[in-house]
């Protein structure tokens, strides 16, 4: 049991330390069934497994738009492209901090009396609505 933990840990660390490269990655997924829709005539080649360790490639010919369903376990290959992401750590000169001072903000004194008057008008309106 400890051996498998050590192997798994070393495998993960070697993947983490590996140098990144662009390219195509192909993964294989074992599915218990497969359904797809083919809008055009085509040939699908699936690896279908009759038993756990006996798998064979089998072509499925599609002559018209239809849904293809495979109920046996099969291996599905998926490929995708990997690309390296370039991270820019410096700002362009057009986005440098501004050297202009912020504008002065002044406050208006004496506005409290206007707020009190508005509150009184609201109370009177509510009282009138209740009558």
UniProtKB/Swiss-Prot annotation:
It is found in: Cell membrane. Induction: Induced during cell wall regeneration. Expression is also increased under high-iron conditions. Repressed by the HAP43 transcription factor. Keywords: Cell membrane, Glycoprotein, GPI-anchor, Lipoprotein, Membrane, Signal, Virulence. Residues 111-131 form a propeptide. It is a lipid-anchor; GPI-anchor. GO terms for cellular component: plasma membrane; side of membrane. The keyword NADP does not apply. Disruption phenotype: Leads to hyperfilamentation, increased biofilm formation and reduced virulence in a mouse model of disseminated candidiasis. Also leads to increased susceptibility to antifungals (fluconazol, posaconazol or amphotericin B) that target the plasma membrane and to altered sensitivities to environmental (heat, osmotic and oxidative) stresses. Residues 1-18 form the signal peptide. Its main location: membrane. Glycans are attached at residues 22, 104. Transmembrane segments: none annotated. A lipid is attached at residue 110 (GPI-anchor amidated glycine). GO terms for biological process: cellular response to starvation; filamentous growth; fungal-type cell wall organization; negative regulation of filamentous growth; single-species biofilm formation on inanimate substrate. GPI-anchored protein involved in proper cell wall integrity. Does not seem to be directly involved in the synthesis of the cell wall. Required for normal virulence in a mouse model of disseminated candidiasis. This is Predicted GPI-anchored protein 26.
């Amino acid at each position: 049991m400890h051996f498998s933990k050590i192997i798994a840990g070393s495998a993960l660390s070697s993947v983490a330390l590996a140098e990144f490269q662009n390219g195509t990655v192909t993964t294989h997924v074992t599915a218990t069934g497969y359904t797809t829709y083919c809008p055009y005539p085509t040939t699908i080649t699936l690896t279908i497994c009759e038993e756990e360790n006996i798998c064979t490639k089998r072509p499925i010919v599609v002559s018209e738009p239809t849904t293809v369903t495979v109920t046996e376990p099969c291996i599905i290959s998926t490929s995708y492209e990997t690309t390296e992401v370039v991270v820019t750590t410096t700002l362009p000169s057009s986005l440098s901090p501004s050297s202009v001072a912020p504008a002065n903000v002044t406050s208006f004194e004496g506005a409290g009396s206007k707020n009190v008057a508005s509150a009184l008008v609201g109370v009177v309106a509510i009282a009138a609505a209740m009558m």
